[in-house]
């Protein structure tokens, strides 16, 4: 693998994990965003989840019909909304309460979001460490080249 590919792969991981952290933050911020059950115009916030995918690059020496690919990191081709039903809370005094007195809130579990946040942070840190290691190797190679 060429040296600069390691920078690109690590950078793609950092970018994807930063997006994941942004989505987690959005989920936590909107945990108490209310909606009105049954009203399509007043639906509660839906938890957003990134879909991760490999970045693949076709190699130049591929035989037609037998393409070969190099792994070039990760990216987020799309963001999905959690299909889980909203949680209903009985609060007849709320302005969004339905005729039975229920208000819809996002079905977001704060503990799961915190675990995801720690996971994304650790993955981001691993990418930073990989970039620093690649940088150190490049510097050593330059020193060796100088003689």
What are these regions (language model features)?
Residues 1-147:
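Amphipathic alpha-helical polymerization modules
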């Amino acid at each position: 693998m060429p040296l600069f590919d390691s920078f690109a792969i690590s950078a793609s991981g950092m970018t994807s994990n930063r997006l994941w952290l942004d989505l987690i933050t959005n989920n936590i911020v909107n945990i108490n965003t209310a909606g009105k059950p049954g009203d399509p115009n007043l639906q509660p916030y839906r938890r957003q989840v990134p879909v991760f995918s490999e970045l693949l690059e076709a190699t130049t020496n591929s035989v037609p019909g037998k393409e070969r690919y190099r792994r070039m990191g990760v990216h987020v081709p799309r963001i999905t909304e959690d299909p889980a039903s909203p949680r209903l809370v009985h609060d007849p005094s709320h302005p969004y309460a339905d005729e039975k007195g229920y208000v819809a809130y996002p079905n977001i579990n704060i503990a799961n979001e915190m675990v995801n946040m720690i996971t994304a942070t650790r993955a981001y840190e691993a990418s930073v460490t990989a970039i620093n290691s690649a940088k150190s190797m490049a510097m050593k190679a330059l020193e060796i080249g100088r003689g």
